[in-house]
Structures are given as structure tokens and as C-alpha cells.
């Protein structure tokens, strides 16, 4: 994967600001939460970009593309790397297609492989290890992902989970699977809606 030659930072930043504002307005009009795009907060998106830049992961997995706001920022953080593999999953084809359009509009369409698939199915069939995994999907299914996530993480791998402060009760059992596992060192960060970071230290 690589950054398309048409990428321009000023355009990217203004585009992301516009996308967040537009989708937030859309979300505010949706009664059913499942119809909302529910992007990460801008400060969380910037944090993801910083982690991607610092860590320089060669293999990245995002679970929960939605319409691509966090996807854009992860791709932004990866943009200086010569070679990497970034996969973003979503079960909703229309949202994945919207994300594809946003990536094209910002010159980052060559940076991400968008896959429409259930995360549980993907994780259970996956044989790869990822340096960075970002999880921001339907929280009710997180516990189903535990085994697949452990398999996809190795020493030095980083797992980041969104909404761990705003929706603490919904994710506490899932997070405990990592905080109580001696193979990981974990932190909860007061960034945006709350980010959880687990870094694998042992096999």
C-alpha cells in the first residue's frame, strides 16, 4: 500500500473536518443508533494517526470501517511508510463504499484494503499477526472476538478500543479479558470517548 500522488495535507485536514461535521449532523437526526455512522472523536482520530506514525506498523487491521473517518486518519498516519498492509473491515457494504469514496477524495485510495465481512468470521479464519488493531464496532459482539484477537496479536502488537469511558459498562467484561491477562500491559486513556490500549508483551 502507498499514498496516492494526489494526496495533499491541507485538503485532507479540511476534508476530515467537513466529513466529521456532516456525519455528526446526520447522526443527530437518526433515532435508531444502528443507522448512525458514529465516528471516533477528532482527538481520538489524531491519536490513532500518531500511534500509526510512531509505531510504523507493517500490518494494520481496523474492525468497524463505518464511512471511513478513523480509516482516513490511520491511513494518514501510515502515509510515510514505503510498504504496509492496512485492512479495514465492515459488515455494511454501503458504508464501506462510502469510505472508499472518501479515501479516493483525499488521495488515499491506494492505502487501504476495504473488506465487507463479519469480523467474527474474519478473525476466526485469519492466520496473520497484526502490529496494530483498532476496534470500534458493535460492542455486544466484542466478547466473541476474544480468541481471534489473541491469535492476531503477538509481542509488540497493539490493540486500541474506542468508547471505553463513554460506554464503560458495555465493554468492561471484554476489557477484563486483557487487563487480567499477564501477556498484556493495558492502559485506559482519557482521549475522546475513552481509548483502551493493550500492548502484548509475551507469547
What role is predicted for each listed range?
Residues 1-132, 139-160, 165-203:
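A short alpha-helical cap/connector motif
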Amino acid at each position: 500500500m502507498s499514498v496516492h500522488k494526489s494526496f495533499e495535507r491541507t485538503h485532507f485536514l479540511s476534508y476530515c473536518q467537513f466529513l466529521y461535521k456532516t456525519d455528526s449532523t446526520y447522526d443527530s437526526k437518526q433515532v435508531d443508533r444502528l443507522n448512525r455512522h458514529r465516528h471516533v472523536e477528532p482527538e481520538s482520530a489524531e491519536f490513532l494517526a500518531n500511534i500509526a506514525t510512531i509505531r510504523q506498523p507493517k500490518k494494520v487491521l481496523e474492525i468497524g470501517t463505518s464511512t471511513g473517518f478513523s480509516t482516513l486518519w490511520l491511513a494518514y498516519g501510515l502515509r510515510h511508510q514505503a510498504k504496509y498492509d492496512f485492512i479495514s473491515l465492515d459488515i455494511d457494504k454501503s458504508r464501506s463504499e462510502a469510505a472508499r469514496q472518501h479515501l479516493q477524495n483525499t488521495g488515499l485510495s491506494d492505502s487501504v484494503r476495504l473488506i465487507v465481512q463479519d469480523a467474527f468470521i474474519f478473525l476466526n479464519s485469519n492466520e496473520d499477526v497484526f502490529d496494530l488493531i483498532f476496534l470500534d464496532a458493535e460492542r455486544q459482539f466484542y466478547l466473541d472476538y476474544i480468541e481471534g484477537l489473541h491469535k492476531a496479536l503477538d509481542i509488540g502488537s497493539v490493540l486500541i478500543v474506542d468508547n471505553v469511558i463513554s460506554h464503560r459498562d458495555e465493554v468492561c467484561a471484554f476489557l477484563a479479558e486483557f487487563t487480567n491477562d499477564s501477556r498484556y500491559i493495558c492502559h485506559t486513556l482519557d482521549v475522546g470517548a475513552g481509548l483502551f490500549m493493550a500492548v502484548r508483551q509475551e507469547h
